[in-house]
Amino acid sequence: MSVDVKSDFSENESSSTPSPTTVPADVTWPHYPMMPFMQPHPLREKMLQPTFDPQIYGRWSQMGDTGFYGHPDLYPFGLPQLAANGQIPAVEAVDVKPPLSNGSSSSDSGMYPSPSDMMTPFPSTSSGAASSSELSAAAAAAANYQMRAATCYQQSVWPFMDYQQFQGFSWKMPLGNNHGKDRRSSSDGKTLPTGPGTNNVRVRTADKYRMVYSDYQRLELEKEFHTSPFITSDRKSQLSTMLSLTERQIKIWFQNRRAKDRRDKQKIRL
């Protein structure tokens, strides 16, 4: 009884164990194509020479400079004729000479222009002989062109560079400036009333020049300002007579001086 069970167990065990399967060597995998480097000869079809030639692919060629021309399959274009010793024969220089004249019967006479054609500016349009009037007209036109070119290039390319350097506004110029002298001379020519009753006399006219006070006038006005920032009408008339200024000029000077004093005090506070 036991023997039968053992035999049954051995049969079941042998049947449950899978037998190893052998994979043929030439099996193909359609979903996994073989990589290029796995092929036996991947680059043979792309090589210039299917067989290895040490004279062509060697690092140091043993056949000289002319050995490369010995392969017509590699150099099919313009191969020179090799001599028996493997050297390229020297080519004789060909001396090409231009024709002597236009009437020569040489086959290559049209390749080289004649000296007469080279002297003519436009061979296709110019006549054989130009008249003296045409030559004189051409000479006059050339002279006129040269004169106009010289006149043009004498001038500056940038017009603003031809003007004098800007020195500033005329009403800010010192006494030595010519523009300020002209404007002051025009204003000095006018006799302005001074003294009492000149509070409404306008000195600035259409010229819009700025009044330039002398050192003496500025000194006296500064002394008066330090005495009192606000000038009275009596003192204003006295200064007008003494400084040869109108009362309006003195009033405006004091207004500007008080504004300057306020700005200076604000700067000190900051």
Swiss-Prot record:
The keyword Transcription applies. Blastomeres. Embryo. Oocytes. Residues 206-265 bind DNA. One of its GO terms (biological process) is embryo development ending in birth or egg hatching. GO terms for molecular function: DNA-binding transcription factor activity, RNA polymerase II-specific; RNA polymerase II transcription regulatory region sequence-specific DNA binding. Disruption phenotype: Embryos shows disorganization of cell types and lack specification. Loss of V6 rays development in male tail. C and D blastomere derived muscle. The keyword rRNA-binding does not apply. It holds the Pfam family Homeodomain. Residues 14-24, 101-130 have a biased composition (Low complexity). CDD domains: homeodomain. Keywords: Activator, Centromere, Chromosome, Developmental protein, DNA-binding, Homeobox, Kinetochore, Nucleus, Transcription, Transcription regulation. It is found in: Nucleus; Chromosome, Centromere, Kinetochore; Chromosome. Disulfide bonds: none annotated. GO terms for cellular component: condensed nuclear chromosome; kinetochore; nucleus. Residues 1-24, 96-130, 175-201 are annotated as: Disordered. Induction: By heat shock. Fifth intron is thought to contain a regulatory element required for expression in postembryonic neuroblast V6 cells. 3'-UTR thought to inhibit self-translation in anterior blastomeres. Interacts with tir-1 and let-756. Transcriptional activator. Interacts with promoter regions for tbx-8.9, tbx-9, elt-1, hnd-1, scrt-1, and vab-7 genes. Binds the sequence ATTTATGAC. Binds to the enhancer region of the hlh-1 gene promoter during embryonic body wall muscle development. Activates the gene for mab-5 in embryo development. Necessary for vab-7 expression in C blastomeres in the posterior of embryos. Required for posterior V6 neuroectoblast cell fate specification during postembryonic neurogenesis (patterning) which generates the characteristic ray lineage during male tail development. Belongs to the Caudal homeobox family. This is Homeobox protein pal-1. It comes from Caenorhabditis elegans.
